[in-house]
Structure formats: C-alpha cells, structure tokens
C-alpha cells in the first residue's frame, strides 16, 4: 500500500535509509535534534509522467490524488523523517548532479553549528523514464555507443541509472561514546557557482577549481593531503575536459587516483 503511494525515487530513499540506520544502530538522541537533509535532482518524475498519460487517456477524474505528494522533490526526505520520527530540520536540496553532495555538506554544517546531534543525509534519483531519456538524448548527453567512459578520449556521453545512497552523520564525540561503527569523517565542504551555463561548465573548469580550493580551506588541508579524488566524470566532452583542467589546477602534476562512479 505504501509503495503504491510513493514514487520509485522515494522507495529507493527509504530502502537506503533503512540500511544506513540499521548499520548505525539506534540513535539515542532527542528526535528534535535529528535532521533529514536530502538531495535529488528531479524527484518524482516517473509518477508525473504516468499520471499525465492517465489524464490524457482516461480523464481528469482518474488522476491519482497522491500525484502531488508523490512528485514533490522533498517527498523522499520527508518520508524518511516521518518513518523514523526525526523532528529536526527536514530539507531537500535540488541542485542537479550536485544535490546529494550539497545535502551532505549542509548536514555536516548543522552538526558543526550545534543545531543537530545527528542527520540522515544523502540522495535518491529515479529519472530513467521515457521522456527524460528522450530529453537527455536530444541534448546529446547520452552515449550513442551505450558505454560510459569518463575522461576517455572517445567518450560521448553517459548512461542513465537510478538508485539512492544515505549516510548517518553524528558528532564525532557522541558517535565514539556510543560505540558507533564509524566509516568516515567529514572534515570540510564547500559549494559555489560558476555562473556560466545551465548544462555546461565554465571554460577551464574555473568554478570547480575554486570549489575544491574552498573545500580544502574549510578542512584545513593542503592539496598534498588528498589521496583520492571522486570526480563527477559524466563522460561528456565538455564536463570531463573542464573537470580534468580543474583537478590539474588544484593538484598539479601529482599522481592522485581519480575515480568516477
């Protein structure tokens, strides 16, 4: 019943959140100090497409009364908050491909500022629909060879996928005190805009360069401290070129492993 009333994007989010919370163990904090900061680029597009077809073929009275809450971008984060009773800030970040990373950074800030003791954060997406695929294909963002090859000389686009990833962030001292299984520590985050184009990065990757520099400054680290770079790596000609230039600008000629998942 719940599944029928939630878009696949929300279903992915709840499944991933369940796994993350199970791994973290019970959060022994005041619910008003547990937040949910979530990211998505599009939200419930699949439901919207399906209901548009229903409207056209069967009439307006057959459109689901759950359409609006199912298609809203904040549905996934809200669903997590409601399922677990988290009463802290429940906010959604919708910044395209950067949404989940922005959400994690914002979540870490809430803890650093003392507003929250824990925040469930991450992102979910389920936009591999017929209309979205057509749109991405017509803007030549998808690979014509059906192979995603980030940073390869023959790259020609990406392949659409769906899924979710969720983390449980806590204050370090509180996580240690309760014996939590700690997998990583967030030491810095940053965001900015290159103010260039809605789908293309600024030439030379100057926006990405500045963002990485700001993140290093926030963390109190030097570029020489970084041992791995998790790149955007969309396998598109424009992005990968600009991103490679940005990485070189920040890290120089150092041989730092670069991955793109």
Sequence positions of predicted segments:
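Beta-strand segments within the central parallel beta-sheet cores of soluble alpha/beta enzyme folds
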Residues: 31-38, 91-95, 116-124, 181-189, ...
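Short loop segments at secondary-structure junctions
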Residues: 25, 114, 170-174
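Conserved active-site "lid/cap" helical segment
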Residues: 1-34, 211, 215-223
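Short beta-strand-to-turn element immediately C-terminal to the catalytic PLP-Schiff-base lysine
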Residues: 142, 167-171, 217, 239, ...
């Amino acid at each position: 019943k719940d599944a029928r009333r939630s878009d696949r994007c929300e279903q992915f989010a709840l499944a991933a959140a369940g796994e993350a919370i199970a791994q973290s163990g019970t959060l022994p904090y005041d619910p008003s100090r547990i937040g949910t900061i979530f990211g998505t680029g599009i939200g419930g597009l699949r439901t919207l497409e399906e209901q548009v077809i229903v409207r056209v073929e069967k009439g307006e009275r057959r459109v689901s009364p759950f359409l609006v809450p199912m298609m809203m971008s904040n549905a996934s984060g809200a669903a997590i908050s409601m399922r677990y009773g988290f009463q802290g800030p429940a906010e959604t970040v919708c910044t395209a491909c950067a949404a989940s990373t922005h959400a994690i950074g914002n979540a870490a800030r809430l803890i650093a500022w003392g507003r929250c003791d824990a925040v469930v954060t991450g992102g979910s997406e389920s936009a591999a629909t017929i209309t979205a695929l057509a749109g991405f294909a017509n803007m030549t963002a998808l690979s014509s060879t059906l192979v995603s090859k980030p940073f390869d000389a023959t790259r020609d686009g990406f392949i659409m996928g769906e899924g979710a990833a969720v983390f449980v962030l806590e204050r370090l001292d509180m996580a240690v005190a309760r014996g939590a299984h700690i997998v990583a520590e967030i030491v810095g985050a940053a965001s900015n805009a290159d103010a260039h184009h809605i789908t293309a990065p600024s030439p030379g990757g100057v926006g990405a360069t500045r963002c990485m520099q700001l993140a290093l400054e926030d963390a109190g680290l030097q570029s020489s401290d970084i041992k791995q770079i998790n790149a955007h790596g969309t396998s598109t000609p424009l992005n990968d070129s600009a991103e490679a230039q940005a990485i070189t600008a920040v890290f120089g000629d150092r041989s730092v492993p670069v991955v793109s998942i």
